[in-house]
């Protein structure tokens, strides 16, 4: 019996990457019944590296240069239950990528001075660039789980400055954070779109905690990190997000942490502030607009500092008690 993922729109989209019928012209639907679009490009082990990347568009008959939005799915590791049917995929994913990358991340205590990726990550990056070239005017939405999360992180980090601006949003789940094995140039690229990348990790899933420090949270990580407040499942189900639960607002329930929730909120507000500043600057600032921007920036910073202080006091009190 197939279990249900929690009914979060973006998680549901991400997990369509495991659809057994995923192939060219396949109509992609989430488990909850929402239609995402049609697969128009497939990159399945094109160079023997094991990558599986899919481009999905709403109208496959539309001219490529007219397409406004493309969903890119990076498939995660082939599960142990498929070892006999997909032995080559299983070996590629687990032995030549998951294990290798995990080892490199754990040995790399500080950010690297060079790219320490694998061939699958590089093949995935080529696939994303190819998709973006085919659809030159489209905004790109990126999704990935497990190894697919790492493929997605690396692919975005490998884009050029003019290309990365087209990433509209990215939602990645239960994969190691590869920030510390990226080159300095690649880290700058993902940092430039940090608030567009939503990086979910389950503290009860050992795989998704590789390369992470719960105290640092989103600091020194790819994107905004969210630690999921999950229920306990067996090893496989925990990793496959079946421990995820929704809060009262219908969003994935996350753990509160100064360096995640408050820091993430600060970054998002500052991102909105920057967009507002750019819009107002088009005609030059009036004195009133400059005063408004200064007070807005100060207000965001003050509110975040206050929340961090309150959170810090609560943590100290809980430790003392």
Language-model-detected regions and their locations in the chain:
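Serine hydrolase/lipase
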Residues: 62, 66-69, 129-141, 157-321
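Gly/Ala-rich beta-loop-alpha elbow adjacent to hydrolase catalytic centers
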Residues: 144-148, 152
């Amino acid at each position: 019996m197939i279990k249900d993922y929690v009914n979060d729109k973006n998680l549901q989209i991400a997990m369509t990457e495991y659809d057994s019928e995923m192939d060219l012209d396949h109509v992609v639907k989430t488990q909850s019944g929402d239609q995402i679009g049609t697969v128009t490009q497939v990159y399945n082990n094109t160079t023997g590296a094991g990558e599986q990347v899919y481009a999905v568009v709403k109208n496959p008959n539309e001219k490529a240069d007219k397409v406004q939005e493309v969903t890119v799915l990076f498939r995660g590791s082939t599960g142990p239950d498929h070892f006999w049917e997909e032995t080559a995929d299983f070996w590629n994913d687990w032995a030549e990528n998951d294990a290798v990358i995990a080892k490199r991340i754990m040995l790399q205590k500080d950010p690297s001075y060079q790219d320490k990726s694998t061939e699958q990550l590089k093949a995935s990056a080529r696939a994303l660039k190819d998709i973006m070239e085919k659809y030159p005017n489209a905004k790109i939405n990126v999704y990935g789980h497990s190894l697919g999360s790492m493929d997605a992180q690396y692919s975005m980090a490998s884009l050029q400055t003019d290309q990365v601006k087209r990433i509209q949003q990215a939602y990645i789940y239960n994969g190691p954070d590869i920030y510390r094995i990226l080159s300095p140039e690649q880290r700058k690229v993902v940092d430039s779109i940090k608030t567009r990348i939503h990086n979910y990790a389950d503290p009860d899933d050992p795989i998704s905690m590789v390369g992470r420090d719960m105290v640092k949270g989103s600091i020194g990580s790819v994107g905004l990190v969210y630690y999921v407040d999950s229920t306990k499942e067996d090893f496989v189900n925990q990793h496959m997000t079946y421990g995820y639960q929704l809060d009262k607002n219908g969003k994935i329930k996350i753990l509160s942490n100064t360096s995640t929730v408050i820091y993430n909120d600060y970054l998002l507000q500052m991102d909105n502030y920057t967009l507002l500043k750019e819009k107002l600057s088009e005609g030059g600032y009036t004195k009133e607009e400059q005063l408004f921007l200064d007070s807005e920036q100060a207000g965001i910073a003050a509110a975040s500092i206050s929340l961090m202080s309150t959170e810090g006091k609560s943590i100290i009190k809980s430790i003392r008690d």
